[in-house]
Amino acid sequence: MSKEIVLEDHAFLVSETNEKGIITFASDDFCEIAGYSVEELIGKPHNLVRHPDMPKAAFKNLWDTVKDGNIWTGYVKNATKNGDYYWVYATVYPTITSEGTKGYLPCRRKATSEEIQKAINLYKTLQ
């Protein structure tokens, strides 16, 4: 049975992906919480940490938002390498380099228990 991993108050999980969602950078906090080494994450799709409880509609909204060049925020339940899970409040920034290369910068912090409960209730309506 999986268990919830509760982030430390100071934890700040950062990653970068290319336009197709392939991880190009993973912070130490992200690696530690997700249970992967940086080498295991680089080059893999970011949905590697997607938890099956997350409704597809939430990620459709995320992708539609950032592909349009807008910032997305929301609560996400992610899966760890060993099958546990953790909740985050995520902000995903669309990025573009000076060379014109597009990508995304997801930044995540600890979600409070109240925020998590609201997200659970909302996501039940989207299943």
Language-model features: locations:
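Sensory/regulatory domains in signal-transduction proteins
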Residues: 3-125
